[in-house]
């Protein structure tokens, strides 16, 4: 609420208003004199016009301050400067009082709000409740709090300005600073690329020989088939030439076809080539990859963002449908997995807490039996139970597991799944089944498995959904550690203050930082509570004219009591002794920050 005077003697309905005092307009006198000098123009303009030179001379010499280097506030019959007293027939609150405009032109300012906040040269923040003008408004806990746009913003701007006022760093120092900030990120990306290259090189060494041997065996079989077919054809031709046998065209075609079918079966051993070649024009005789099990596995891999090499969509309509299906289904899948994972994590937390309490009670019981001090240990045990359940500070304690525990949990689930898969796929080894299950739950891929049994298909779907929930549970429990590690790496070499915070949190952090610097140590909740209770809450209403109507004990006479208010104001501003007495009654406000 800005200070303005509605009662101004003027031809128009104009009102005098006072803007925010900038740092260059401060007086070189005491703190109280500075505040009183701010109220002088308002009181004078309230009771008489600014055109009265006699009244203007009533201002003491040491309370005058300069608008610029050559012009005083009032000199003779001159008009008051626009920078301090502005005539305006518009609303009593104008842009001249905007704290944003004032903040662009000054670093420190005297904010005449309720309560009055001022920042001294040494950085102290003074909150004054006596000289603040309230216009008859009652003070409550809400109105007495700092205005976020004025009080705390000034603190934040002061901190930022102090940081900007530091000496600029040289070019090598700036280079070292940016290198320090970029170094952990470059190292992280380099480690990731190196890890990928290392994995590719190791897999290349492990799988190259096996892949070459498998392909060589296949080519050997094809070579043998071609050699046998050539030998058989030559034998049949020789026998026909020598008259040993007679061969017609149909017999030769059947023999040649048989050898070609064998070659095709060797190249593609996953399709019933022989049956399909018998009736190639009959579509019902063809092998269909898009069965319900394979289609279900495909859409499952679409929602879990892992691949399936057995089938893929080829039509344009199918591709559009797959995209639309994934846009709706992927969030649904992960929300469901997260919900189940949260339930599993809460269940695990309750189980571990119950286990810890049970073990603790057993140990206490064994200790009581062993030492025979039941009563004392029972009382101590009852207190410990409360502390263990709620934590030391009365909050629910967090369950902490090392990172290896979450990895072990995932591996245990994959082992259970591999034991299930082995019962359905007799040709699979434990390692093969474990790898298959792990690829499913970490959304690597389903491979090119062909499922024909519906029970086995149902087990795979359930394994994938529950597996994603288990992974989500592990990530949820390990999020605290992962977030701490990520924060350390991401903000290495730079300050974490104000990053990712809202504007309100920035103001609070700035206020606490100022309190910590003034206190010289850690700011506790008691410090904040004392500051709020002592300065901003439970403050009685004090009229803004309290100091003007105040009488000293040596001035209480029948004559003084009948002096009119206006003449008393003249005496008030004429006598510097009165100002000295007022200053003696109101010592400097303590700096709570």
UniProtKB/Swiss-Prot annotation:
<keyword id="KW-0472">Membrane</keyword>
<dbReference type="GO" id="GO:0071805">
    <property type="term" value="P:potassium ion transmembrane transport"/>
</dbReference>
<dbReference type="GO" id="GO:0005886">
    <property type="term" value="C:plasma membrane"/>
</dbReference>
<comment type="similarity">
    <text>Belongs to the two pore domain potassium channel (TC 1.A.1.8) family.</text>
</comment>
<keyword id="KW-1133">Transmembrane helix</keyword>
<keyword id="KW-0406">Ion transport</keyword>
<dbReference type="GO" id="GO:0006936">
    <property type="term" value="P:muscle contraction"/>
</dbReference>
<dbReference type="GO" id="GO:0040011">
    <property type="term" value="P:locomotion"/>
</dbReference>
<feature type="transmembrane region" description="Helical">
    <location>
        <begin position="291"/>
        <end position="311"/>
    </location>
</feature>
<feature type="transmembrane region" description="Helical">
    <location>
        <begin position="402"/>
        <end position="422"/>
    </location>
</feature>
<dbReference type="InterPro" id="IPR013099">
    <property type="entry name" value="K_chnl_dom"/>
</dbReference>
<dbReference type="InterPro" id="IPR003280">
    <property type="entry name" value="2pore_dom_K_chnl"/>
</dbReference>
<comment type="function">
    <text>Has a role in mobility, possibly in the transport of potassium in muscles.</text>
</comment>
<dbReference type="GO" id="GO:0022841">
    <property type="term" value="F:potassium ion leak channel activity"/>
</dbReference>
<keyword id="KW-0407">Ion channel</keyword>
<protein>
    <recommendedName>
        <fullName>Uncoordinated protein 58</fullName>
    </recommendedName>
</protein>
<dbReference type="GO" id="GO:0015271">
    <property type="term" value="F:outward rectifier potassium channel activity"/>
</dbReference>
<feature type="transmembrane region" description="Helical">
    <location>
        <begin position="320"/>
        <end position="340"/>
    </location>
</feature>
<feature type="transmembrane region" description="Helical">
    <location>
        <begin position="186"/>
        <end position="206"/>
    </location>
</feature>
<dbReference type="Pfam" id="PF07885">
    <property type="entry name" value="Ion_trans_2"/>
</dbReference>
<keyword id="KW-0813">Transport</keyword>
<keyword id="KW-0812">Transmembrane</keyword>
<feature type="transmembrane region" description="Helical">
    <location>
        <begin position="430"/>
        <end position="450"/>
    </location>
</feature>
<dbReference type="GO" id="GO:0007567">
    <property type="term" value="P:parturition"/>
</dbReference>
<feature type="transmembrane region" description="Helical">
    <location>
        <begin position="455"/>
        <end position="475"/>
    </location>
</feature>
């Amino acid at each position: 609420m800005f200070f303005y005077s509605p009662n101004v003697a003027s031809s128009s309905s104009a009102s005098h208003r006072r803007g925010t005092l900038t740092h260059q307009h401060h007086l070189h006198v005491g703190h109280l004199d500075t505040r009183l000098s701010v109220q002088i123009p308002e009181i004078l303009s309230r009771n008489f016009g600014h055109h009265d030179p006699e009244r203007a001379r009533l201002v003491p010499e040491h309370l005058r301050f300069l608008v610029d280097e050559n012009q005083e506030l009032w000199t003779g019959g001159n008009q008051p400067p626009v920078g301090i007293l502005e005539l305006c027939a518009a609303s009593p609150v104008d842009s001249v009082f905007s704290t944003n405009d004032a903040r662009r032109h000054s670093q420190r300012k005297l904010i005449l709000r309720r309560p009055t906040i001022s920042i001294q040269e040494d950085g102290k923040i003074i909150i004054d409740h006596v000289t603040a003008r309230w216009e008859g408004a009652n003070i409550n806990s809400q109105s007495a709090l700092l205005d976020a746009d004025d009080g705390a913003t000034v603190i934040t701007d002061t901190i930022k300005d102090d940081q900007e006022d530091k000496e600029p760093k040289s070019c090598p120092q700036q280079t070292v600073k940016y290198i320090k900030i970029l170094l952990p990120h470059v190292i992280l990306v380099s480690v990731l690329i190196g890890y990928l290259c290392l994995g590719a090189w190791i897999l290349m060494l492990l799988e190259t020989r096996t892949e070459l041997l498998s392909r060589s065996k296949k080519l050997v079989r094809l070579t043998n088939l071609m050699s046998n077919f050539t030998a058989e054809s030559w034998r049949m031709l020789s026998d026909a030439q020598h008259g040993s046998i007679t061969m017609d065209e149909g017999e030769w075609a059947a023999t040649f076809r048989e050898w070609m079918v064998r070659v095709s079966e060797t190249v593609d051993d996953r399709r019933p080539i022989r049956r399909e070649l018998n009736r190639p024009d009959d579509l019902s005789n063809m092998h269909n990859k898009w069965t319900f099990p394979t289609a279900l596995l495909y859409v499952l891999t679409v929602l879990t963002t892992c691949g399936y090499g057995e089938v893929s969509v080829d039509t344009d309509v199918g591709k559009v449908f797959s995209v639309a299906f994934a846009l709706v289904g992927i969030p649904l899948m992960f929300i469901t997995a997260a919900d189940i994972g949260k339930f599993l994590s809460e269940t695990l937390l309750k189980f571990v807490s119950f286990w810890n309490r049970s073990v603790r009670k057993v140990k206490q019981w064994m200790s009581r039996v062993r030492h025979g001090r039941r009563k004392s240990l029972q009382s101590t045990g009852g207190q410990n139970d409360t502390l263990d359940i709620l934590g030391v500070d009365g909050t629910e304690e967090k369950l902490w597991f090392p990172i290896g525990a979450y990895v072990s949990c995932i591996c245990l689930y994959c082992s259970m799944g591999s034991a299930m898969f082995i019962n359905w796929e007799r040709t699979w080894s434990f390692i093969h089944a474990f790898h298959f299950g792990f690829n499913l739950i970490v959304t690597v891929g389903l491979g090119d498995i062909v499922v024909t049994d519906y029970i086995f298909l149902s087990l795979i779907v359930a394994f994938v959904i529950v597996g994603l929930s288990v992974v989500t549970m592990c990530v949820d429990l390990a999020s605290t550690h992962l977030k701490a590690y990520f924060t350390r790496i991401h903000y290495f070499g730079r300050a974490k203050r104000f990053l990712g915070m809202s504007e309100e949190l920035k103001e609070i952090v700035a206020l606490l930082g100022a309190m910590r610097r003034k206190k010289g140590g850690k700011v506790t909740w008691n410090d904040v509570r004392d500051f709020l209770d002592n300065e901003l809450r439970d403050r009685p209403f004090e009229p803004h004219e309290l100091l003007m109507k105040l009488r000293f004990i040596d001035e209480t006479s029948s004559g003084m009591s009948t002096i009119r208010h206006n003449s008393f104001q003249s005496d008030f501003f004429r006598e510097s002794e009165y100002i000295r007495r007022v200053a003696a009654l109101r010592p400097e406000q303590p700096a709570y920050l």
